[in-house]
Curated annotation (Swiss-Prot):
GO terms for cellular component: nucleolus; spliceosomal complex. The lineage of its organism: Eukaryota, Metazoa, Chordata, Craniata, Vertebrata. The gene is prkrip1. It comes from Xenopus tropicalis. Residues 99-161 form a coiled coil. It holds the Pfam family DUF1168. Residues 124-142 have a biased composition (Basic residues). It comes from the Eukaryota. GO terms for molecular function: double-stranded RNA binding. This is PRKR-interacting protein 1 homolog. It is found in: Nucleus; Nucleus, Nucleolus. GO terms for biological process: mRNA processing; RNA splicing. Component of the pre-catalytic and post-catalytic spliceosome complexes.
Length: 173
């Protein structure tokens, strides 16, 4: 009937059936995700934000009623005291962990700098050694060239000497 009235809906484009692929390892899984993303490059990829690190509530600046665990406190007060104490212990433990992490990071950075300095020293030492060897080879090459040049000059002198010309004159006769 819809065809008769002229208000027919256009046919929806069917999606191509995708073969079922089960990733065997992490690289296959990554490849499949990338292929899926690249099918429609205009669509924005969802990048999850990093979860915030847990931190305890800050300690109150002013506590109006300071309670203790003494025998004079009522039973309701003890629970309040216990919760406050637990929160304070959590806060102190958190601060200790942050401090420890900071110390470890500083030690790591210091160690990295020491290693980098040692590597640079080794590299400089090796570079100097290479340069010395290169210079030594260059000097040997120059000495060999000079020696060859002197030898050629010696031969030229012998050829131009009067004794050699006398010998050649004798040979001509």
């Amino acid at each position: 009937m819809a065809a008769e009235t002229g208000t027919a809906k256009p046919a929806r484009a069917k999606k191509e059936p995708q073969p079922l692929v089960i990733p065997k390892n992490a690289t296959d899984e990554q490849r499949l995700r990338l292929e899926r993303l690249m099918r429609n490059p205009d669509k924005l990829a969802a990048i999850p934000e990093r979860p915030k690190e847990w931190s305890p509530r800050s300690a109150p600046e002013f506590v109006r009623d300071v309670m203790g665990s003494s025998a004079g406190a009522g039973s309701g007060e003890f629970h309040v005291y216990r919760h406050l104490r637990r929160r304070e212990y959590q806060r102190q433990e958190f601060l200790d962990r942050v401090s420890e992490k900071h110390n470890l990071d500083d030690d790591f950075q210091r160690k990295l700098m020491e290693n980098k300095k040692l590597e640079e020293e080794k590299t400089a030492k090796r570079r100097l050694k290479r340069q010395k060897l290169k210079e030594k080879k260059k000097m040997a090459k120059m000495a060999k060239k000079e020696e060859k040049k002197e030898e050629i000059e010696k031969h030229v002198e012998l050829d131009n000497s009067p004794e050699s010309s006398d010998k050649s004159d004798l040979e001509d006769q």
